[in-house]
Amino acid sequence: MRRGWRGGLGLSLTLLCLILVCILVIDRPLALLMHRLFHHSPWFLGLAAIGQIPLSFAAPGLVVAAIAGWWGWRPRGRGWTWIAVALAVTIAITLKDLLKQAFGRTWPETWTHHNPSLIHDGVYGFWPFHGGEGWSSFPSGHTTAIAAVAGVLWWRLPHLRWLWALLVGLTAFGLVAGTVHFLGDVLAGGLLGFLTGRATLALPFPTEDRPAR
């Protein structure tokens, strides 16, 4: 167990360093390159939309589970797994909203209320606690959501780890290639979501049906 947490800590620190490198060196030229190569390609925007699925269904799923529990439903096995998924996504997107406001990063492209962006205005940077949708690129919400799902199912359904990794990878690739987000945004979202999903499994679920850790 200690070895697993040690390895996870090492990987998290490595990703944090990589995120910093992206912000300082990679994000700007990569976004400009993606814009030239794939500007507004529907294929990449479609991949990015994978991350919208858990964003749309997590909170309603918890409400439905609560109502079902009120009427006598007692989840077992897979039921607790999907409750853990919905809870992880809900917590993760709450955290990412706070971080978006705290970091105040501008977007690669202009998409709302003439927000300043790298591609349209040459604006690139962080304006902490600026507020507004135009200053909320970091971290990526779509990547955070799909990574939170993966963070639970990676241990709960380990035989499908290839699928969870693929879904996160496709979402992240679509966001970066479609210049919806910078690479650093999706790496930060992936780290936040996955760690939140993993941490959710430590919550006190009923012992006999506790999601695998």
Predicted features along the sequence, with ranges:
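Alpha-helical transmembrane spans of integral membrane proteins, capturing the lipid-embedded, hydrophobic core
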Residues: S12-L20, F57, V85-I93, V186, ...
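Hydrophobic, aromatic-rich transmembrane alpha-helices
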Residues: L62-G72, I146-W154
